[in-house]
Amino acid sequence: VRKNSSEANNRILGWDAVGEIIEIGSKVTSFKVGDSVWYAGDLTRDGSNAEFQAVDERIISLKPITVSNAEAAALPLTAITAWEMLFDRFQISETEVGSILIIGGAGGVGSIAIQLLKAKTNLTVIATASREETKSWVESLGADHVIDHSKDLNAQIETLGIEKPKYVFSTNHTDTYIKQIVSLIAPQGKLGLIDDPQTFDIMPFKTKSISIHWELMFTRSLFQTPDMLAQHTLLTEVARLVDAGRL
């Protein structure tokens, strides 16, 4: 296979990584040789499944020091995805009250989202899980309420005796839950998704004036957006939270 493929089309794969800086460019100001950093990569460059990798300083930060390299390397992509949805797309403030529903609370992104919400906001966190082990998992992460995603979500939320969630963060199978989300979300709420539903009819959300938000953590580096440095900033804060034992 390799013999018959063009070298011009070859790509080195790999996203999440921890590494030690061995060389810096002339315009780099935030890091020095010897720094241990973590990051999630860039779609426009070769990936981390290699001994050496060139990475833009705006999308990396110093890694947390209280966990192993292997443990740290498992976090950047899910942490960036969760952070950007919660604080960039939804723009949740630290003092805001209300509730949020996370569909897929036991998954990688959902697990980080729960912890970020408990560490940095006052929102009541409702997470979905169905098996006993996943229910226990999301509870251990700090979810205030756990509901079964295989059952009627709206009915379960109503039995909790709390207001309809203003935010719904759907991490998977969004097309399965669309009709339920329309019913359970608060008027003028926000729906965020990270998966790729085959069909997605947004018209039912019009009556409630719901805003729809997609999140792809590679967008900033892919388009070299003016706020690309935000990923360095958020990874720095995530590392601080890890070292503080809050993630």
Regions found by a protein language model. Give the residues of each.
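NAD(P)H dinucleotide-binding glycine-rich loop of Rossmann-like/cofactor-binding domains
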Residues: 40-104
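C-terminal substrate-binding/catalytic core of Rossmann-like NAD(P)-dependent dehydrogenases/reductases
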Residues: 204-247
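Short, glycine/polar-rich helix-capping loops at beta-to-alpha or helix-loop-helix junctions
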Residues: 48-49, 130-137, 199-202
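Glycine-rich cofactor phosphate-binding loops and adjacent beta1-alpha1 units
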Residues: 93-95, 141, 145-215
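Short, flexible surface segments
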Residues: 30-33, 96-97, 187
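Receiver (REC) domain switch-region micro-motif
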Residues: 37, 100, 168
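Glycine-rich beta-strand-centered segment in the early N-terminal region that forms part
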Residues: 2-44
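Mid-domain Rossmann-like dinucleotide-binding core that forms the NAD(H)/NADP(H) cofactor-binding site
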Residues: 75-151
